[in-house]
Amino acid sequence: MATINDIGVAAAINIVTAFAFLLAFAIFRIQPVNDRVYFPKWYLKGLRSSSIQTGGFGSKFINLDFRSYIRFLNWMPEALKMPEPELVDHAGLDSVVYLRIYLLGLKIFFPIACVAFTTMVPVNWTNKGLDRLRHSNISFSDIDKLSLSNIPNGSPRFWVHLCMAYAITFWTCFILKREYQNIALMRLQFLANDQRRPNQFTVLVRNIPADPHESICELVEHFFKVNHPDHYLTFQAVHDATKLSELVLTRKQMQNLLDYNINKHMRNLSNRPVIKMGFLGCCGEEADGIKYYTSVVEGLTREISEEKQRLRTGTKSIVPAAFVSFKSRWGAAVCAQTQQTRNPTEWLTEWAAEPRDIYYDNLALPYVDLKIRRLIVGVAYFFLTFFFMIPIAFVQSLANIEGIEKAFPFLKPLIEVKLLKSIIQGFLPGIALKIFLLFLPRILMQMSKFEGFVSTSSLERRAATRFYMFQFINVFLGSIVTGTAFQQLNSFLNQSANDIPKTIGVSIPMKATFFITYIMVDGWAGVAGEILRLKPLIIYHLKNSFLVRTEKDREEATDPGTIGFNTGEPQIQLYFLLGLVYAAVSPILLPFILVFFGLAFVVYRHQVINVYNQKYESAGKFWPDVHRRVVTALVVSQLLLMGLLSTKHASKSTPLLLVLPLLTIGFHKHCKNRYQPAFVTYPLQQEAMIKDTLDRIREPNLNLKAFLRDAYAHPEFRVGEDPEPEEKLESDMSPPDLVATKRWSWRNTPLPSKDSCREIP
């Protein structure tokens, strides 16, 4: 197991690595050639222009102002300078709420760390429990004397740990409640102050039943004119536009090549650009590049127009789902929050996500398929979690060399070199675990897409939930179980089964050393590596050197990325779990967690301001998940402490811990009932009706139908289209007295019903 020297070596490696990353970033960011990599958000907002096109040859690529190198650390205060309301306007509420997770960690753990180091550390260190176990084949190091393992069985000092558990619980619940309340208020204010957006008036309707007499479009029109006659406005059918998407992508590529050849010709008017028609443009007949790509683009444009017309006029491409818009937010809220028919599996309604958040590929999935898909994903996830225990066991074998040496003495000469041993135990386990987890988020995101979620935000929240469960089962519990097995392997082999729980109770607190190494690799060096953006930097310069032909290519060469809720939030929750579990067991871990939260807050605030470009805005809808996982970590810490004290024969203090999980669960239910509705439902009176009234006063002649007409059309339908002329408002606000329908009578008569007509207007 890792000793103090091993932890010191690991800390030195990670501190040097993090400092090198931060120093490299501070220098790279001020170079004009890297401007698009480190400030892409300002380019997207149109507030920054490329410096490569201006200035002398040297100043295009290298910053020649030596005074800027003196101020190279100014990015830290600049990242903290922007006030929160301005940050909401600049980056959105999702980004601000995400940053508040790091602040939540600082608010919870800083006071806990202060109390733990003034009370828990002296109580643990001044005992001799581990010294008395030297004869029992239990492996430990001096750093483990700071943990609960150093207290002998039945000691009255366990009352201090009991009091600490109560203090941690009450303080954490207090901070969680206050933060939940503040963020719920921020969300409601954001929605109240938000400008008019299509998703405020629109509901997604799924699982529309088939009808032998009417098409999907006619059925939707008929259903909502009948059931919501005073509020229904219009609808947007959902098409399977796979072929259209492929055509649009191909035309975009060909248009880019055409622009490149035109620019090439403009630089040298005497020569027309020539291309070869053979394999990869390396052989074959020669042709005029401009004429060739012009004809290709024109042909693809005709194909796209024909495909759009086919999708609009045909019915086979329409899927049983639609975006239904209403004349008011109140009408949309009523529809989204009520059951439409007796059959709860038909005409399913929910608030539509904003247009850029919609994941169109999953809208066509039938309701029955969703159940089957989720069952398949559940089984696949179980086996993925189960088989991942193998690399976890391998990582733990690296972290417990002493235990392996005792069980397998022939390996001792290979790993006894002092520096090598410190690196293996203090640094290698953390980096190995980080590597094994590298591709997991992509796998979990593909699982979420297969499950059928219809918005990017719901996909990320689902993937985050699975990633958190995976981290809890494999990284936390798996590391403890397999690590304890390797660490105390010799002890297990030479003691009776009745003594194994006692050995586990002693060794679990000692696993803090492994998690310390992981926190330093992932939370220190990893966060510093995030701000350096080494991968996007390399990709940008490779594209800029070999693939960029036009200014549009240069704009697309850098992906600004997003906050990555599906990967970042579960990682943060692992630190909450480790901090709450080990606060009363082995407080030595807390300073490492505090460094992570502090560094990550500064780094990600800088990234949110200058780099990340969110793909959607959910107004902090993910916060209930954050709250629930912190509460889960708190309950796990209480149960684990209860189990540890029971193995230490603290019979008088242990029963008093039984009340803590009950109080915590009751607290969670209170917060769920009090604050979660703000993240799930839309208040009809205070929010919907007030905003509708203000709209009618401020813009009495608003043409809402024109505003919503193509808001939820498939993105490829909106490419290269001219806006249609606006219609009069009066036509939108006066529904017909009779609802047109093509449904035939069911009473054995060939005549249509009296309200039927040949075509719905």
From Swiss-Prot:
Concerning InterPro entries, the annotation shows: Csc1-like, CSC1/OSCA1-like_7TM, CSC1/OSCA1-like_cyt, Csc1/OSCA1-like_N
List the transmembrane segments: 7-27, 101-121, 156-176, 375-395, 419-439, 467-487, 512-532, 583-603, 630-650, 653-673
- Where in the sequence does UniProt note compositional bias of the Basic and acidic residues kind? 718-731
Which protein are we looking at? Hyperosmolality-gated Ca2+ permeable channel 1.6
Locate the region Disordered. Answer: 718-761
Q: Which GO terms describe its molecular function?
A: calcium-activated cation channel activity
Topology versus the membrane, per the UniProt entry? Multi-pass membrane protein
Q: Which family does it belong to?
A: Belongs to the CSC1 (TC 1.A.17) family.
Could you list this entry's UniProt keywords, alphabetically sorted: Calcium, Ion channel, Ion transport, Membrane, Transmembrane, Transmembrane helix, Transport
Q: What is its main location?
A: membrane
GO cellular component, as recorded: membrane
For this protein's source organism, the top of the classification is:
Eukaryota, Viridiplantae, Streptophyta, Embryophyta, Tracheophyta
Instruction: Look up keyword Membrane and say if it applies.
Output: yes
Subcellular location field: Membrane
Task: Detail the disulphide connectivity of this chain as listed in its UniProt entry.
Answer: none
Give the function comment from the record.
Answer: Acts as an osmosensitive calcium-permeable cation channel.
Pfam families on file = PHM7_cyt, RSN1_7TM, RSN1_TM
